[in-house]
């Protein structure tokens, strides 16, 4: 990698940024990030970046508002420093779940965040497993949406799990589960959630054969872990031999870690798109690095090669 490229990291996930730089064979850019006494964010770029192709690595994870504001201030500082281009690497795109109006008088937050980022000025977005594909259309610049599936499939295949079933926790994720099943030679099952009538508890039914099978619950994120833990209990109740869980983004808010710990998961596998604090690291959690994938994509962008061929 030549000296015409620079990678800067915000505070949200410095570890993945450093791993990306290691794979690219460069040092991360020097940046001074701090807060004033009133809570406002201060940004100063310490390197000369004039004419450089710049990549900013920043997930908009919790605290989402601070990390989002930090990102757009870094973007503005670099733009005013006369860089040649800005690509924003957002391993986890926060506010992505509010991608449409589901009831009257609510915002489409994913679009608002896209507008905020775009109005500051950038040339490209690089992200991973957006909650909704239509978010790519909220930007007028190119959006490369990378996928955790190849990294996860390689890991699962090394475990050599027999009688494998990939389970979608809802009907909306069935296509994701089916596609992943082809990568790991697993069959498909779906958990169908229904509420028979008002004020009656939600009922979970399993569509597919899971008795005596090893199941992997597959989702794009784990937030409070309520749904995924209930789904695991249902699978075990229906005779599953073991239950694993895999998701790209480990949001792990609220009592998520306690719920995971008290559920009979064999293992919960996450990408490292969100930094997990030490207080939330438990034996059941396994983190797989997607830094090499991001580094490869950055290399391809820099050399004007196809990014999509990474997943052919």
UniProtKB/Swiss-Prot annotation:
Any one Gene Ontology molecular-function term assigned to this protein's record: magnesium ion binding
Pfam families listed in its UniProt record: Pribosyl_synth, Pribosyltran_N
Record localization: Cytoplasm
GO terms (BP aspect): 5-phosphoribose 1-diphosphate biosynthetic process; purine nucleotide biosynthetic process; ribonucleoside monophosphate biosynthetic process
Note describing how the cofactor binds: Binds 2 Mg(2+) ions per subunit.
Pathway per the UniProt entry: Metabolic intermediate biosynthesis; 5-phospho-alpha-D-ribose 1-diphosphate biosynthesis; 5-phospho-alpha-D-ribose 1-diphosphate from D-ribose 5-phosphate (route I): step 1/1
EC number, UniProt record: 2.7.6.1
Binding residue positions for D-ribose 5-phosphate: 195, 219, 223-227
One of the record's GO cellular component terms: cytoplasm
Required cofactor(s): Mg(2+)
SUPFAM superfamilies: PRTase-like
Binding site for ATP: 38-40, 97-98
InterPro entries linked: PRib_PP_synth_CS, Pribosyltran_N, PRibTrfase_dom, PRTase-like, Rib-P_diPkinase, Rib-P_diPkinase_bac
Record field: catalytic activity: D-ribose 5-phosphate + ATP = 5-phospho-alpha-D-ribose 1-diphosphate + AMP + H(+)
Heme found in the keyword field: no
Active-site residues from the entry: 193
Binding of Mg(2+) 2, residues: 170
Role description: Involved in the biosynthesis of the central metabolite phospho-alpha-D-ribosyl-1-pyrophosphate (PRPP) via the transfer of pyrophosphoryl group from ATP to 1-hydroxyl of ribose-5-phosphate (Rib-5-P).
Family membership noted in the UniProt record: Belongs to the ribose-phosphate pyrophosphokinase family. Class I subfamily.
The protein, known as: Ribose-phosphate pyrophosphokinase
